């Protein structure tokens, strides 16, 4: 686990006054840490509106989640596509001004996407759980709640909002947290896509022996720079292990052209998560065909 949790400001007493004093360790070291620290505040605010107990009650009447793994494995297009709905990002700002989640979801399904990823982080990506709910009403495809999950509360909220799967990021979670949150998802019959960015994180995940969907993020979440070599280098080392353990490797981010897609398919990548490439184009169908029709 590379990302710290927000340290509390120490309390200082002066006679009858107590106040918190900010210190150097209370400053986030990078974008990812800043996002994670803000999640603590966001979750507290969510709980003021809807309690965990109320979320659990709402889940009782929901149908079982859709099978994320199966949809990627049986995809007609190869590699299987997790198409992402994302309005903005910390590095690019607003990516898609003409943002209609319902229309985008319908388009993705018609084009043959296996699953859809929906950004739910509000402050940094201009996403929301309301967008996830809208997309759920617009498509029959399995939905991934794309967020920075650090609490069981977020998993229950994702399920109530229509998610079939969640993302867990190895860089922000300890091994104990990963196992605990995976058990929560398993109990709700939700799929889990666990995300790694380097061999150290991947080794951690493989040792846990709990995940059959592993996302290799080509974007360094500390700097938000992308490099497709991340997937290529890790696949050269771990492709045989993935195959033997029935793990579906998913390459995420930085996939911009048909050549990128073919390079990933040829080394054993079974699924790709693509968002910005579609979101920045006014004609999503045209962008899709540039990627998939030539491989």
From Swiss-Prot:
Top enzyme class: lyase
Signal peptide: none
Organism name: Prochlorococcus marinus (strain MIT 9312)
Keyword Lyase included in the entry's annotation: yes
Alphabetical list of PROSITE patterns matching this protein: IGPS
Annotated Pfam families: IGPS
Keywords associated with the record: Amino-acid biosynthesis, Aromatic amino acid biosynthesis, Decarboxylase, Lyase, Tryptophan biosynthesis
Official protein name in the record: Indole-3-glycerol phosphate synthase
